[in-house]
Swiss-Prot record:
Region of interest (Disordered), ranges: 456-488, 1171-1219, 1340-1453, 1657-1676, 1811-1834
Bias type Pro residues, positions: 1201-1212
A GO CC term assigned to this protein in UniProt: apical plasma membrane
Record text on subunit structure and interactions: Forms a ternary complex with PALS1 and CRB1. Component of a complex whose core is composed of ARHGAP17, AMOT, PALS1, INADL/PATJ and PARD3/PAR3. Forms a heterotrimeric complex composed of MMP5, LIN7B and PATJ; the N-terminal L27 domain of PALS1 interacts with the L27 domain of PATJ and the C-terminal L27 domain of PALS1 interacts with the L27 domain of LIN7B. Component of a complex composed of CRB3, PALS1 and PATJ. As part of the Crumbs complex; interacts with WWP1, the interaction is enhanced by AMOTL2 and facilitates WWP1 localization to the plasma membrane.
UniProt entry keywords in alphabetical sequence: Cell junction, Cell membrane, Cytoplasm, Membrane, Phosphoprotein, Repeat, Tight junction
UniProt xrefs under InterPro entries: L27_2 (IPR015132), L27_dom (IPR004172), L27_dom_sf (IPR036892), PDZ (IPR001478), PDZ_scaffold (IPR051342), PDZ_sf (IPR036034)
Annotated organism of origin: Mus musculus
Localization: Cell junction, Tight junction; Apical cell membrane; Cytoplasm, Perinuclear region
Residues recorded as bearing Phosphoserine in the entry: S455, S459, S482, S524, S647, S1215
Protein name (database record): InaD-like protein
């Protein structure tokens, strides 16, 4: 059997890992299954249990061999396999004879070495007459030995002895029952702990022992014999204590915590120390401060430590039941533990009596009485001095806590030296030992202290001793020495010290930062300010007072230096970040007033300015004050005295000084678990990195970081890399990597100082480092607050290293940031993105500090050294200043040139905007026709670039004259719907462009992406223009984009052939594009670059970001005039020279050496991830139609939550390697043919090349709505498909580029087609029956007299993300044969709307819309000649008078009147209704508005007590278009609320109902949102439930909260689930409780109403209104209920058609299997008492996602005869609906195809859809005509 199976098991696992890795590298997968099974076996709990059991059996054999014959051996095994003795004699002591009869020699069961005379004599000498015990303990496979030790100095021998401090209950040592507290360990594994073994070596022996641990301990004889009787007295309160009151308290945790804190220990008991005001315990009212906790549940906690009690509380779950006691009868006398060494005899001295004439000190004694739950109230610090031996060494009082026992005593002062505690001389004790002695003291503590007389000042802390300054931090004089950590001697900290490594206290070395504070005159105002704030803040903060006397003329003069920077930044030279009343310096501008002081630095907190306290004020108040406060400025700042980092190879050179390395031992026990959600994790795989250490070291610095898996341990993390150091050159180390070993020395649980010593001790040469890389987790993002003192001066040497100070605050600052925090990756690199940008990683914590931005002002070309770095404040008022600045600075002349007639928007380069965490609710409106376009996406924040090692270069070279060109001026573009695009983000940086829309001329072409996402943004509407491509007009002074690249510039970006594939499915980089810049004589190119071979940052997908990036583009330069390059673009190639792996110098040389023109290949970041096909990843989207005769068409885009974050793949150079492609193609084609072998028809596989207009195909769906098909309904004769000749109308698309379209809806197909690359591989099938299945008849061939078109009601354009309207893109205009006017191509992202008839009176759009209407009516009338026509014609009917189309039937001259007070609301119609409010209000809750993605005013809920509920016609989901003549179609949310509130007694509403939007979740945009919930903080959102019905919705989003910072949620979103738990039918209270209780990462499933229907209905209403104005007929369009027409139709059918039996087919039986969670998916109409008359019940609609559609046996118009055998004859509509709703399992329907019913169903469908005159939502169906025209039976 192995000696140490646990260790060997880990070795085997490591071997398996290596083996699997090697096999994977070789591509061998044959052994994967066996290796996985072996691996899982070793990791299984059962296997571990077997190993533990084997060890227990081995241990049992050893125990049994030592038990005397007169003792029984009762034992058992625990469930985990651990050995447990149950014998009474063993329990009370050892399994042996009484001690008086047993000698040490009889109990030596071990080897000859152990039994040797030498060993025995050493042990007996060390025991000094005490009883000797020999103990053998088996170390378990997991966990420790279960006891802690303490080192105390022996007074007799002067040696450090090791004593057992505590045996942990339930541990291995506790179950063995032999090791006792206060036992002295004499030997470990046969090694005596004599003078040859140091304290550290002894600890190492215990920690490194494996297998069996053999201990020899010494114990006092009396202590051993009386142990059984005294143990309880030592660990618990005396049993004789009588409590005056005991009470059982039960608390139900609601997720906010129990609301009380505990302190105490084993001897004093655990008591309630604090009760949080407003917390759970406070609200309950029964628990009181000072209560002793006796029991928790069924667990007796007397004798436990406070930490153990806290753990018991944590394990209780939500319900905590406690037995507490108070008011003890009589005094509780707790006997302090007997000291292990005799107390030193001190001379009996009176208080403050010593020979004062001879000694510089005075000694006095103090008696302190602890109160229950209170500490002594002193904080100590240890110091080992070398300058004055015997004088300064010792333990000193560092500070006194106000209100504590020491404070009330009044005798103890700061800087007093403690020499004895309860008579025990502590001089020479280690700091940790003194802490233990004081903790173990009883209720009354006697302290002996020494104080230097006031006339002398040799104390290690020169400080005033007055009572007023007891909390003041001591100043530290320059003195050689090393501090001991300070400790707060509080009872509540009793257990924390036990977890600290004693070694750390003696090895931490720290260097004090140099004293840079100017000397202050005593008694000066500065000193008074400093003293006042020091008293307020306490010793953890350093207060600094600075005076600035800056010469400032006026604000306008300042603003000349920067149009973007706020006034207070320019005045003070620093930027301030604010959070929760705290204002921190985020950065200091180089050369500014603050920088010249050399006093303040980033992360300092600004407390007061010119007597005005800023602490506690809002950011707006603080910034407003800083703007107006006059100079000189008196600043009061504080800095936290905490630094836990050290540099490995380059320690900072400083003056020898004393620094207090504070280790705070105090803790307020928190019942809630710590939230480790933010802590980084590292891969368990250890990677070995080999570095060659040179004379400069290894070239990196480190810091320690709390281990996320064990809060008591720390790990060593790479902090930063030294520029051009060994580590950076190797490229294998990055900041954030965990350092686990150096050569053979493991750094597991090593302290920072130890790790530093190990690294320094490594000799020069090859060094092997063990590295663990960070795990990549998308839902966990750390926040890095980056501040730099880098001035960006390019004249600095390249190897200059700039210190970058920044930190990661793991805890949200509470109070005054008075809790210690750790640091992580403090030198996280960043990028100064020229002109105005420093990006930070996005933060989800509400404690985040504001975004920052560093700007480099554009210097003159001859003055690069004068660059200044400044900051931009994020206050919203600044943007108004920016706008005014823009208005006062017109664009350059070349942009303001006159232009031809075509309206084109030009991009004004260089005008950049910032949006950063606006806190106000005000909205900045775009001035005049200007629009703000965000040119940078939110995802760009994820990239940070280091400028520490980068040099920037401005190319100011002589160049030849530009080459004139006459090409490239024919391409013009247009922004569509500039006024309606909104920014996607509200809490991120957006760099925008000002675009004056009133400029004319063919100057700039900018193409929008396929999808422009929008989201509600309350602060500032910014507009995003991602991936802008530009084409400039030819000019003698402007760079050109040559004609051979003009087409590429006009199109959405695409990869050229052979550029390689991208591995991620999404890329935030746009594809490479070519930009040509023509040089001009004596003018520089106008760009500066940064970057090189240095790895800038590790991306989240593991890639390394590096390369050459554009830092700045000068406006009036050749590069700036092209508008084709912008800050942040990555340069891949320059005039054929690949720069992807080039150094900075090589890139500079390549640009200098490039000819004329300079040809750049660049990549830009796009606003939304570009979908990359998985097989052929060369993506492209065609450009919009460049038709100059059409008006700007408005296409409202509504985006869901942003797609998951992915990162750009590395760019790969073009490759011409085509080997094997033909074989792969043949193999793929064979698989495709096998896949579709069962489909009827002829399969075709072709490849086409897209042109600028796409493939030239028009697509439509299947006539049968239950089937998903994509048919070709039109082919552009000038398009690639027609030129190829192999595709025909009627072909059904199955695949595009190996992405399957078969069985997909139009929405899915549209998304796939949009991302198709230039070369498209199409798989389609040709079937003769396809034409009859198509929802749209084939488009006619191009002619001057278009033939009639069939019904287009089922058409859905592939070009739109949402359901698109039928528009001019389908058909050519009748009077034009230009290629541009032909059928619109696939993937066009523009939707036509509102064609003006004056411009194109016979346009195809109008013809199609009319034909949709008239043809449908005609088709109905063929069956029924007397079928009624629409009640009134619109303008579209008049347009058709040209004779191109079949004229509609005559109009009924007498339309029925509609009473607005009683008429029902017909789905799909704009209805006018009137509601009398009575004495109550309307009772409506609305959501949406023009300023929201919903883009419409929609009723959210109808309250029962309101007038609308009494009226009964309005439903939740109805859209309100008008209120008493006030148009709400384009109103904001607040405007709509105002209009509804100001209504008179009778309210006239125009409403629109689209029931399909609310029928099921198919009409919700469902997406996931991950929010990180911090401890003690909420998610930052409010919820509300409906008063009637189910569903919980977001009612408000708290500014600065997690939801607000995430930015994806808006008011009105429905919460569908929380962490996978369904909330669709949960109550508001249930959801609120769950959201409060969750911790860490919270995943919300959100449903948001699709905005397409609202936008579509608005378009419909606008069309209708426009038609009314232009109608030739005097008849006003009527929206009379469709019911009337249907009733006429039914009557006509009954009177004119033959008997029913002649029209019926044979009944057929349809079987449906329906689960409880399934939707049946059919809607019915008819029934007894129906508004349509007493007609049979029939199927009005079949939903594609229902179970009924899967049978493919039901059709719209089928009459239902019976349900599960129950006939429906005579049943009402409601009864039939209930039957279907309650039918589950096996459902048998008998249906029959009835032509009468089919005609009614068809007419119902036509009238509800056709009355919209070509509604954009082509597959919207009013499925029913009962009351509100439909009820869904599911």
């Amino acid at each position: 059997m192995p000696e140490n199976p646990a260790a060997e098991k880990m070795q085997v696992l490591q071997v398996l890992d290596r083996l699997r890795g090697k096999l994977q590298e070789k591509g061998d997968t044959t052994q994967n299954e066996k290796l996985s099974a072996f691996y899982e076996t070793l990791k299984s709990p059962l296997f571990n249990q077997i190993l533990t059991l084997q060890q227990s059996i081995k241990q049992l054999k050893g125990q049994l061999s030592h038990i005397p014959s007169d003792c029984s051996a009762n034992f058992d095994f625990s469930r985990k396999g651990l050995l447990v003795f149950t014998d009474g004699s063993i329990t009370n002591g050892n399994a042996q004879r009484p001690c008086s009869n047993v000698t040490a020699s009889e109990l030596l069961p071990w080897t000859q070495k152990s039994a040797s005379e030498d060993f025995n004599s050493v042990i007996q000498q060390m025991a000094q007459g005490r009883h000797v015990e020999y103990i053998d303990i088996e170390r378990p496979s997991t966990g420790g030995l279960g006891f802690s030790v303490v080192a105390l100095r022996s007074q007799s021998l002067g040696l450090i002895d090791i004593f057992v401090k505590e045996v942990h209950p339930g541990s291995v040592a506790d179950r063995d029952h032999r090791l006792k507290e206060n036992d002295q360990i004499l030997a470990i594994n046969d090694t005596p702990l004599d003078q040859n073994i140091s304290h550290q070596q002894a600890i190492a022996l215990l920690q490194q022992a494996t297998g069996s641990l053999r201990l020899v301990v010494a114990r006092e004889v009396g202590h051993t014999q009386g142990r059984a009787s005294t143990s309880s007295a030592d660990t618990t309160l005396p049993e004789t204590v009588c409590w005056g009151h005991t009470e059982e308290v039960e608390l139900i945790n609601d997720g906010s915590g129990l609301g009380f804190g505990i302190v105490g220990g084993k001897s004093s008991g655990v008591v309630v120390r604090t009760i949080v005001p407003g917390g759970l315990a406070d609200r309950d009212g029964r628990l009181q401060t000072g209560d002793h906790i006796l029991k928790i549940g069924g667990t007796n906690v007397q004798g436990m430590t406070s930490e153990q009690v806290a753990q018991v509380l944590r394990n209780c779950g939500n319900s905590v039941r406690m037995l507490v006691a108070r008011d003890p009868v009589g005094e509780i006398a707790v006997t302090p533990p007997t000291p292990v060494s005799l107390p030193v005899a001190l001379p009996a001295v009176a208080t403050r009596t010593l020979d004062s004439d001879r000694s510089p000190f005075e000694t006095y004694s103090v008696e302190l009485v602890k109160k229950d739950g209170q500490s002594l109230g002193i904080r100590i610090v240890g110091y080992v001095g070398t300058a004055h031996p015997g004088e300064a060494s010792g333990i000193y009082v560092k500070s006194i806590i106000p209100g504590s026992a020491a404070y009330h005593n009044g005798q103890i002062q700061v800087n007093d030296k403690i020499v004895a505690v309860d008579g025990v001389n502590i001089q020479g004790f280690a700091n940790q030992d003194v802490v233990e002695v004081l903790r173990n003291a009883g209720q009354v503590v006697h302290l002996t202290l020494v104080r230097r007389k006031t006339s002398l000042s040799a104390s290690p802390f020169e400080h005033s001793s007055s009572r007023e300054t007891v909390a003041e931090p001591p100043k530290v004089p320059e003195r050689a020495g090393s501090p001991k950590p300070e400790a707060n001697l509080s009872v509540e900290a009793e257990e924390i010290g036990e977890r600290l490594d004693n070694l750390k206290n003696n090895t931490v070395q720290a260097l004090e930062k140099p004293d840079v504070y100017p000397e202050k005159v005593p008694g000066s105002p500065e000193n008074e300010l400093k003293s006042r704030w020091e008293n307020l803040l306490g010793p953890d903060y350093e207060v600094m007072v600075a005076t600035l006397d800056a010469q400032i003329a006026d604000d306008e003069e300042l603003q000349k230096y920067s149009k973007l920077l706020p006034i207070h930044t320019l005045r003070l030279g620093m930027e301030v970040d604010s959070f929760d009343g705290h204002h921190y310096i985020s950065s200091v501008a180089p050369g500014g007033p603050v920088d010249t002081l050399n006093l303040l630095q980033p992360e300092d907190e600004l407390l007061e300015v010119n007597g005005m306290q800023l602490y506690g004020k809002s950011r707006r108040e603080a910034v407003s004050f800083l703007k107006e406060v006059p100079p000189p400025f008196t600043l009061v700042c504080c800095r936290r005295l905490f630094d836990d980092e050290a540099s490995v190879d380059e320690p900072r050179t400083m003056e020898p000084a004393l620094l207090e390395a504070e280790v705070d031992h105090s803790v307020d026990v928190n019942i809630e678990d710590d939230d480790d959600g933010e802590l980084a994790l590292w891969s368990p795989e250890v990677k070995t990195v080999e570095l060659v250490k040179d004379c400069k070291g290894l070239g990196f610095s480190i810091l320690d970081y709390q281990d996320p898996l064990d809060p008591t341990r720390s790990v060593i993390v790479i902090r930063s890399l030294v520029a051009d150091g060994v580590a950076e050159r190797s490229g294998e180390l990055l900041p954030g990597d965990r350092l686990v070993s150096v050569n053979e020395f493991s750094l597991d649980n090593a302290t920072l100082a130890e790790a530093v010593e190990v690294l320094k001790a490594v000799p020069p040469g090859v060094v092997h480092l063990g590295i663990c890389k960070p795990l990549v987790e998308d839902e966990k993002e750390e926040r890095f607050s980056l501040h730099s003192n880098n001035n960006g001066d390019s004249s600095e040497p390249a190897d200059a290293v700039h210190e970058i100070h920044s930190s990661l605050i793991l805890e949200a600052p509470q109070g005054f940031r008075d809790e210690p925090y750790l640091e992580e990756l403090v030198d996280e690199p960043f990028l100064d993105l020229g002109k105005s940008l420093q990006f930070q990683q996005k933060d989800v914590d509400s404690s985040s500090e504001a975004w920052e931005m560093h700007e480099f002002l554009s210097p003159p070309l001859d003055g690069r050294g004068e660059e200044r770095e400044m900051l931009v404040d994020e206050e919203y008022e600044l943007y108004q200043d920016h706008l005014r600045a823009m208005e006062s600075n017109p664009p350059p002349p070349h942009i303001r040139e006159a232009a031809p007639a075509s309206p084109v928007l030009e991009l004004q380069a260089g005008t950049q905007w910032l949006h950063a965490n606006l806190s106000g609710g005000e909205r900045l409106e775009c001035h005049d026709a200007e629009s703000m376009m965000s040119a940078y996406p939110q995802e760009m924040q994820q990239y940070s670039y280091s400028t520490a090692d980068m040099m920037e270069e401005t190319f100011g070279l002589d160049s030849r004259a530009p080459i004139p060109s006459s090409e490239g001026n024919g391409q013009h573009g247009r922004f569509d719907d500039m006024g309606h695009l909104h920014s996607l983000t509200s809490s991120s940086l957006d760099l925008g462009m000002m675009i004056p829309s009133d400029l004319q001329g063919p100057g700039v072409l900018v193409d929008l992406p396929a999808v422009a996402q929008r989201r509600e943004q309350e602060d500032l509407p910014l507009y995003r223009l991602p991936s802008a491509r530009v084409v400039t007009k030819p000019s003698s002074h402007m760079g050109l984009v040559s004609s051979r690249h003009a087409n590429a510039a006009c199109e959405l970006p695409e990869r050229e052939e052979g550029e390689g594939e991208e591995t991620p499915n999404f890329s935030h980089w746009g594809p490479p594009r070519i930009v040509e810049i023509f040089r001009e004589p004596n003018v520089s190119l106008g760009i500066s670059i940064v970057g090189g071979q240095t790895v800038i940052k590790r991306l989240k997908n593991g890639e390394e970001l590096k390369g050459i990036f554009i830092k700045q583009v000068l406006e009036d330069s050749p590069a700036g005039k092209t508008n084709a390059l912008k800050t942040g673009d990555k340069i891949l190639e320059v005039s054929g020279v690949d720069l992807q792996n080039a150094s900075h110098a090589e890139a500079v040389e390549a640009i200098k050496s490039a000819g004329n023109p300079v040809v750049f290949v660049v990549q830009s970041l796009s606003s939304t991830p570009r979908v990359i096909p998985t097989v052929n990843n060369k993506g492209k989207t065609p450009a919009p139609n460049q038709d100059q005769n059409t008006q700007e068409r408005k296409a409202k885009r509504h985006g869901t939550a942003p797609p998951p974050m992915k990162l750009p793949p590395p760019y790969r150079a073009p490759s011409a390697d085509m080997e094997g492609s033909e074989e792969d193609c043949a193999l793929t084609d064979k698989k495709i043919r096998q896949r579709y072998a069962d489909l009827p028809g002829e399969l075709h596989i072709i490849e086409l090349e897209k042109d600028k207009n796409g493939l030239g195909l028009s697509l439509a769906g299947n006539k049968d709505r239950s089937r998903m098909s994509i048919f070709v309904v039109g082919i552009n004769p000038e398009g690639p498909a027609a030129a190829d000749g192999r595709m025909r109308i009627g072909d059904e698309l199955l695949e595009i580029n190996n992405q399957i379209l078969y069985g997909r809806s139009h929405q899915n197909a549209s998304a796939i087609i949009k991302t198709a690359p230039t070369r498209v591989k199409l798989v389609f099938i040709r079937n003769e029956d396809a034409v009859s299945q198509m929802a749209v008849a084939p488009f006619p061939e191009l002619s001057h007299s278009p033939s009639p078109v069939e019904d287009l009601g089922g058409t859905e354009l592939v070009s739109s993300e949402e359901e698109s309207s039928v528009d001019a893109k389908h058909l050519p205009e009748p009077e034009s044969s230009k290629p541009e006017d032909l059928s619109q191509v696939v993937d066009d992202n523009m939707v036509a709307e509102q064609q003006k008839e004056s411009e194109s009176p016979d346009s195809a759009a109008c013809q199609i819309k009319q034909q949709t209407y008239s043809t449908q009516v005609s088709s109905s009338s063929q069956d029924s000649p007397s079928s009624p026509a629409p009640l009134c014609q619109s303008a579209h009917a008049d347009v058709t008078g040209s004779g191109n189309f079949q004229a509609p039937l005559p109009v009924d001259p007498a339309p029925l009147s509609v009473d607005p007070a009683t008429c029902p609301i017909v789905p799909g119609q704009e209805m006018i209704i009137e509601i009398s409010k009575g004495r109550s209000g309307l009772g409506l809750s609305i959501v949406g508005g023009k300023d929201t993605p919903l883009d419409a005013i929609v009723i959210h809920e109808v309250y029962e007590e309101g007038a609308a509920a009494r009226d009964g016609r309005l439903w939740a989901g109805d859209q309100i278009l008008e209120v008493n003549g006030v148009d709400l179609r384009s109103s904001s949310h607040e405007e709509a609320i105002t209009a509804l509130r100001q209504t008179p007694q009778k309210v006239r509403l125009v409403v629109y109902r689209d029931e399909a939007q609310y029928r099921d979740e198919e009409n919700l945009e469902v997406f996931l949102v991950d929010l990180q919930k911090k401890t003690g903080r909420g998610l930052g959102l409010s919820i509300v439930g409906k008063r009637s019905g189910s569903g919980v919705f977001i009612s408000d989003i708290v500014k600065g909260g997690a939801a607000d910072l995430d930015g994806r949620l808006i008011r009105g979103d429905q919460i569908l689930s929380v962490n996978g738990e369904d909330m669709r039918h949960a109550s508001q209270e249930t959801v609120a409780t769950i959201l409060k209780c969750v911790q860490g990462l919270v995943q919300l499933e959100i449903g948001r109403l699709r905005a397409g229907s609202w936008a579509a209905s608005r378009k419909t209403s606008q069309n209708s209104q426009g038609d009314q104005h232009s109608a030739h007929s005097s008849c006003r369009p009527s929206f009379a209920p469709v019911i009337t027409s249907l009733q006429n139709l039914v009557g006509t059918k009954r009177s004119s058609d033959p008997p029913q039996k002649c029209t019926e087919e044979e009944p057929r039986t349809v079987e449906i299997i329906r689960e409880l969670s399934d939707a049946l998916g059919i809607s019915i109409a008819g029934g007894k008492g129906s508004p349509l008359g007493d007609i049979p019940i029939f199927i009005a609609m079949i939903q594609a996602n229902g179970v009924a559609a899967r049978t493919q046996k039901l059709k719209v118009g089928d009459r239902i005869v019976s349900i599960n055998g129950q006939p429906l004859d005579g049943l009402s509509h409601t009864d039939a609906v209930n039957l279907l709703k309650n039918a589950f399992g096996r459902i048998i329907l008998q249906v029959v195809a009835d032509t009468n019913i089919s005609a009614i169903a068809t007419q119902l469908e036509i009238m509800s859809a056709g009355s919209q005159l070509g509604s954009p939502t082509a597959d919207r169906h009013p499925e029913d005509t009962e009351e509100q025209m439909q009820r869904t039976a599911d």
